[in-house]
């Protein structure tokens, strides 16, 4: 882990928390909270200027732990008076699985909280699955999150807080945007989070430690591909257009063949990896014909297929394929030249497995509706 693991957050922490015991600080309006942990150096510089801290102090806010003395006592007071806070909040709750997986509940938006999942591996790797939205607009038939409706986009601070505020934060080797929400539907916040994770002034992670999963929003996917070098995971689940649309309404707007055509224009043979997520359902998409159609769809790409066991969420007729069928599907793809593996199911006993995240309602509130 880089030595500057908490550079930007701890630097801001020193600035803001230093004022907490300062009797000269004015009373802060508790309703005005402006988190700093989701800001880029340029944005932090703007904050410094806005509260009359010398312009040069904006950069140390983002890059230095020990040099926060560059912020005067009065400067720290002015930060607090303007409503700025670190924005680092502990999880509201956590639930541990028998397999070591831990599900965390965080404050969300729109009357909903959100969940993230810590997944440790025996080989020392540790992955955090983060959420980007409260609820989701995609309405996939097999996903609990989609059934909650859409309640709002998380801010950059709320996303990065999931990563920085769990007890195992320093142990993380990977972050995957596979929690609640569609990342490309909240792309500005997701891109800012990736910048914070990968930039030298931030946590200095390699982009290879980050994977973004998407249903295939083509404009958002193109922008993500152009602006980052992170790994990409595409939720396919069926290569048959009619069947996929029944499972994933997004197919109507962004046909999977057009998504794959876009991906063929990018290099996934070297540093960046492309994977395809494919949940198997008994008698739906687990047949030899389904396998062959999927293999044809993926020709000309360097995609690897992650076969995912279905975790029933109730309220539908979908059933998981047997282990034997999963293995036959995997072996058949491998025989056709498509690398395929079966993803190990983690956290199912605490409703933390793929497709099972739902968050919690803080109060009764209808789903958010975009203004027409």
Q: Language-model features: where?
A:
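A short loop-to-beta-strand scaffold at the N-terminal edge of the catalytic core in hydrolase folds
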Residues: 113-118
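Conserved alpha-helical substructure of the radical SAM core
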Residues: 146-174
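Short linear Ser/Thr-Pro motifs
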Residues: 94-97, 131-132, 213, 235
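Short beta->alpha linker loops
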Residues: 154, 216, 345-349
């Amino acid at each position: 882990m880089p030595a500057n693991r908490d550079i930007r957050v701890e630097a801001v922490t020193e600035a803001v928390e230093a004022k907490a015991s300062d009797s000269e600080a004015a009373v802060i309006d508790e309703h005005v909270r402006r988190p700093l942990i989701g800001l880029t150096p340029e944005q932090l510089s703007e904050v410094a200027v806005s509260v009359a801290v010398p312009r040069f102090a904006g950069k140390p806010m983002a890059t230095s732990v020990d040099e926060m003395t560059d912020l005067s006592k009065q400067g720290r007071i002015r930060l607090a008076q303007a409503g700025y806070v670190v924005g680092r909040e502990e999880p509201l709750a956590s639930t541990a699985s028998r397999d070591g997986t831990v599900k965390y509940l965080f404050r969300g938006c729109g009357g909903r909280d959100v969940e993230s999942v810590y997944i440790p591996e025996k080989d020392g790797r540790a992955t955090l699955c983060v959420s980007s939205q409260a609820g989701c607009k995609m309405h996939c038939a097999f996903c609990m999150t989609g059934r909650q409706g859409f309640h709002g986009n998380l801010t950059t601070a709320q996303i990065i807080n999931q990563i920085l505020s769990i007890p195992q934060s320093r142990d993380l080797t990977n972050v995957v945007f596979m929690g609640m929400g569609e990342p490309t539907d909240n792309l500005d916040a997701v891109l800012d989070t990736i910048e914070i994770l990968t930039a030298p002034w931030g946590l200095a992670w390699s982009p290879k430690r980050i994977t973004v999963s998407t249903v295939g929003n083509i404009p958002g996917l193109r922008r993500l591909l152009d602006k980052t070098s992170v790994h990409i995971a595409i939720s396919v689940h069926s290569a048959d257009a009619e069947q996929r649309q029944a499972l994933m309404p997004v197919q109507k707007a962004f046909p999977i063949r057009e998504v794959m055509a876009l991906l063929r224009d990018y290099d996934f043979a070297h540093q960046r990896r492309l994977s395809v997520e494919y949940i198997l359902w008994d008698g739906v998409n687990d047949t030899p014909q389904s396998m062959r159609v999927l293999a044809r769809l993926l020709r000309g790409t360097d995609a690897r297929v992650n076969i995912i066991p279905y975790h029933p969420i109730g309220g539908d007729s979908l059933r998981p394929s047997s282990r034997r069928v999963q293995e036959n599907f995997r072996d058949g793809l491998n025989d056709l030249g498509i690398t395929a593996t079966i993803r190990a199911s983690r956290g199912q006993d605490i409703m933390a497995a793929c497709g099972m995240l739902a968050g919690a309602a803080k109060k009764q509130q209808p789903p958010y509706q975009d203004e027409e």
